[in-house]
């Protein structure tokens, strides 16, 4: 028999508290046969089939056997409470090596490309000048109190710019009247489409902003970056891009964004 959204979600939420990793509950609507995540589905939806899922790996490592056991217990409780049959996609014995494989993938391809923009010696950057330069470069202030260059097709951030401070965030006060001791542009390589092109665009923005502000592109130790270093990073990104595709996971895909 079909199950209401609230009935399924109530059982799921009662037992999901034992889990640390990201998990989700999806259902197939009746009528309509559309798969929706119950957490965001309309309250009056009714579902014929349910899928409970758990993320098995990410950049922090693989799921443990005890976590998988708790996940199995959650699905058993749901099956019993909702009086529904149950089928696992794989056993714990099959899931553990698959989780390790995904974890190794995350470790192998976890790459953050970072470029620092430093001010002239003994000086800082004027907040209002930074805001104007970034606006002209097409970057917008947004998530996590940082600037982002958004993809107009997807609305997702292609790369970001942070304050060169411990927190990394920027405040409206700093941008309106403050001084900044440096800027950091960064790109989470596996999570964007066409990472090589995106890094090239990041370098273009970094050069533009640096020129506008009278700054210089530097490494984390404040040494001036040479062309050879950009080439080295670009080569590393191209290699990662092709390796990910050989692995069967495209950079910027939904699967890549879940893992990274």
Question: Where would I find each of the regions flagged by the language model?
Answer:
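Charge-rich interaction surfaces and accessory domains that mediate macromolecular binding and assembly
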Residues: 1-60, 64-73, 77-109, 212-260
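Glycine-rich, acidic/polar active-site loops that bind/position phosphate-bearing ligands
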Residues: 62-72, 124, 128-131, 135-136
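Membrane-proximal, solvent-exposed terminal domains/tails of membrane-associated proteins
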Residues: 88-89, 99-102, 106-125, 132-260
